[in-house]
Amino acid sequence: MVTSVARGRAAHSEPDYIARAEALAEGFAARAAEHDRTGSFPFENFRELSEAGLLSLTVPAVHGGAGAGARYTARVIGIIGKADPSTALVLSMHYINHLVMARSPTWPVRHSRKLARESVEGLALVNALRVEPELGSPARGGLPATVARRTETGWRLSGHKIYSTGSPILKWYLVWARTDEAEPRVGQFLVPAGLRAPASSRPGTITACAPAAAMTSSSTTS
């Protein structure tokens, strides 16, 4: 783990993730202009990040990750960001979500462990789906139009989202939605990426319809 050495280089007995990031940065920088010109997604960057163990940087050490804190992680992001800002943005979202999972009392343990394990073992990124066509950013307040309904196997979600940073490579979405209960709760629902949207979905949006989504956190609207 690197938490105890967040202010400097890793100890000799620990992997030096700063050095790993620096080793990858040159290649990222060389490819960045072409990705910008063509609008292509840097899939190869994330394969290399995964192979270097950098996708699990903020995964707790108890689950096989590096257990890095925010300060050490910021240094890694800075190195990647200087080489390819787009890659760094997607990576930072992934890191933040794992930091939240590790520290949040509302995250179901079995789900946070599953995502942690997948991030350690392979290419499994996660980010939130929050912004909607009518509401815009939830930072301004308001209830999401995306609705979650109870089923025998979990939750069924229906609604529209505009985007999620890194969506071409995400394995998991954290979908922001409200329940259809008399007193709605608002929370995040863990949904696997790759679900097919109905043909009627409006252009530029994502329709989430998950028959067995898992609710990871919630709060009442009152």
Give short role names for the model-derived ranges.
Residues V2-R75:
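Alpha-helical interface subdomain recognition
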Residues F43, R47-S50, L57-H160, T165:
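Glycine-rich flavin
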Residues R117-S119, T165-G166, D180-E181, T207-A210:
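A general structural signal for short secondary-structure junctions and capping/turn motifs
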Residues A124, G142-P144, I169-K171, R185, ...:
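A generic structural signal for well-ordered coil/turn residues at beta-strand boundaries
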Residues E152-R156, W172, A214:
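A generic structural signal for beta-strand entry/edge sites
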Residues H160-S200:
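A short core secondary-structure module
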Residues R196-S222:
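Flexible, small-/acidic-enriched active-site or ligand-binding loops
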